[in-house]
Curated annotation (Swiss-Prot):
Coiled coil: none annotated. It comes from the Bacteria. GO terms for molecular function: proton-transporting ATP synthase activity, rotational mechanism. InterPro entries: ATP_synth_OSCP/delta_N_sf (IPR026015), ATPase_OSCP/d_CS (IPR020781), ATPase_OSCP/dsu (IPR000711). It holds the Pfam family OSCP. Belongs to the ATPase delta chain family. F(1)F(0) ATP synthase produces ATP from ADP in the presence of a proton or sodium gradient. F-type ATPases consist of two structural domains, F(1) containing the extramembraneous catalytic core and F(0) containing the membrane proton channel, linked together by a central stalk and a peripheral stalk. During catalysis, ATP synthesis in the catalytic domain of F(1) is coupled via a rotary mechanism of the central stalk subunits to proton translocation. It is a peripheral membrane protein. F-type ATPases have 2 components, F(1) - the catalytic core - and F(0) - the membrane proton channel. F(1) has five subunits: alpha(3), beta(3), gamma(1), delta(1), epsilon(1). F(0) has three main subunits: a(1), b(2) and c(10-14). The alpha and beta chains form an alternating ring which encloses part of the gamma chain. F(1) is attached to F(0) by a central stalk formed by the gamma and epsilon chains, while a peripheral stalk is formed by the delta and b chains. One of its GO terms (cellular component) is proton-transporting ATP synthase complex. This is ATP synthase subunit delta. It is found in: Cell membrane. Keywords: ATP synthesis, Cell membrane, CF(1), Hydrogen ion transport, Ion transport, Membrane, Transport.
C-alpha cells in the first residue's frame, strides 16, 4: 500500500478522534512541532527506524522527548512505532493539516515575490485569493524568488496564479513561437 494512502488513513483516524474532543488546533500544533523535531534531528529518525532497537525503547524515548503532547498524539506515535511506520509521520501530519484546514475553511498559499511583502500586501492578497479558492481565509507563506523579475506568483494547492513579469514574458514567448509555425 502506498505511503500516501496509509498516511491518509492514520491522519483521518486521528482527526476523527480529536474532532470529537474539540482538540483539532492543539493536535495540529503538536504534530507540526514533532514534525519539525523529526526533520531537524536525523539521529532521532535513525533511532526510530532502526530494526534492532525494540519498540519499547522507542516508545520510552518518544514519551521522554515529547512529554507535553496530548495522549492522542502520543498514542498515535506509539501505534506508528508498533507497526513500523514512523517514516510516514511527516506525510501523516500534512494530511492531518489538510483535514483540519478543510474543516476550518482555510487553505495554505505560497506567494512568490522578488522582495518580502508587507503585512498589508499579504493581507490584501489573502483576502482576494481566499475568495477565488473558495475558502474563508488563507495562511500565506512568502517565498523570495529573484527569477520572477517583478510581480507575484501564488500557489494554492495545485493551482498557480502567475502575475509575475517572467511568467508574462514566458506566455508572450509561447504565443510568438506558436505564430511562427
Amino acid at each position: 500500500m502506498s505511503v500516501t494512502i496509509v498516511s491518509k488513513r492514520y491522519a483521518s483516524a486521528l482527526f476523527d478522534i480529536v474532532l470529537a474532543s474539540s482538540a483539532v488546533d492543539e493536535t495540529e500544533k503538536e504534530l507540526n512541532e514533532i514534525k519539525k523535531v523529526l526533520k531537524a534531528d536525523q539521529e532521532l529518525n535513525d533511532f526510530l527506524v532502526h530494526p534492532k532497537i525494540t519498540a519499547d525503547k522507542k516508545k520510552h524515548l518518544i514519551a521522554e522527548a515529547f512529554k507535553g503532547v496530548s495522549t492522542h498524539v502520543l498514542h498515535t506515535m506509539y501505534l506508528l512505532i508498533d507497526r513500523g511506520r514512523t517514516n510516514i509521520f511527516s506525510e501523516m501530519t500534512s494530511e492531518f493539516v489538510k483535514l483540519a484546514n478543510r474543516t476550518k475553511q482555510i487553505d495554505d498559499a505560497i506567494v512568490y515575490s522578488v522582495k518580502p511583502l508587507s503585512g498589508a500586501e499579504i493581507q490584501s492578497l489573502s483576502e482576494v485569493f481566499a475568495k477565488k479558492a473558495g475558502v474563508t481565509s488563507l495562511r500565506v507563506e512568502n517565498v523570495i524568488d529573484k527569477d520572477l523579475i517583478g510581480g507575484v506568483k501564488i500557489r494554492i494547492g495545485n493551482r498557480i496564479y502567475d502575475g509575475s513579469v517572467s511568467g508574462k514574458l514566458s506566455r508572450i514567448e509561447r504565443q510568438l513561437a506558436g505564430e511562427n509555425r
